[in-house]
């Protein structure tokens, strides 16, 4: 990466970490263990659309590892990596298909994130019974993906003429 690109990547990483921390401070209880709004994923969506696939992957992994060490634990990193990587893969594929807006891509990512975490939970606790959470997690992923997608759509509209590269 060149100087400007590194600086912009650093800003997005810092914002993602700030959003991760802010999310810890928001006392929202969805009644689902580990469920969060996914505010930091807003930065991943923005980087995917403004900087590219490699940069978005680097941001996602960097944010997950750093926020895991700063605010969580090793299991949290494991769950977040599973969800984050599956979410990233789904968002890249949906974005490349060109038939969904950023909102649809974000909904797909939010849903995939929860599925990835559920799959890891099944392996960790060695039972498929945690799969009973799937319907609730799918709805939660759709709702949070929708919210993040709507914010991303608005931000992208406002920074449309700004070159980040």
Predicted regions and their residues:
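Hydrophobic transmembrane alpha-helices
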Residues: 1-46
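Hydrophobic alpha-helical transmembrane segments
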Residues: 6-11, 42, 46, 54-61, ...
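Alpha-helical transmembrane segments in multi-pass membrane proteins
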Residues: 12-19, 48, 59, 63, ...
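Interfacial aromatic-anchored transmembrane helix boundaries in multi-pass membrane proteins
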Residues: 20-37, 62-91, 102, 124-129, ...
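Generic transmembrane alpha-helix motif of multi-pass integral membrane proteins
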Residues: 39-53, 90-95
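Transmembrane-helix signature of multi-pass solute transporters
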Residues: 43, 66, 70, 116-119
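Membrane-embedded alpha-helical hairpins and interfacial helices in multi-pass inner-membrane proteins
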Residues: 73, 77-78, 97-165
């Amino acid at each position: 990466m060149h100087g400007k690109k590194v600086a912009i990547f650093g800003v997005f990483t810092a914002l993602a970490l700030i959003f991760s921390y802010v999310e810890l401070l928001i006392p929202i209880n969805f009644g689902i263990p580990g469920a969060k709004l996914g505010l930091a994923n807003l930065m991943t969506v923005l980087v995917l659309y403004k900087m590219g696939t490699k940069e978005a992957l680097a941001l996602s992994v960097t944010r997950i590892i750093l926020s895991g060490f700063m605010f969580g634990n090793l299991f949290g990193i494991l769950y977040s990596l599973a969800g984050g990587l599956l979410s990233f893969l789904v968002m890249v594929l949906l974005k490349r298909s060109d038939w969904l807006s950023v909102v649809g891509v974000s909904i797909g990512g939010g849903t995939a994130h929860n599925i990835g975490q559920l799959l890891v939970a099944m392996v960790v606790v060695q039972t498929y019974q945690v799969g009973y959470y799937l319907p609730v997690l799918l709805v939660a992923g759709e709702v949070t993906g929708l919210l993040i997608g709507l914010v991303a759509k608005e931000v992208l509209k406002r920074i449309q003429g700004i070159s980040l590269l």
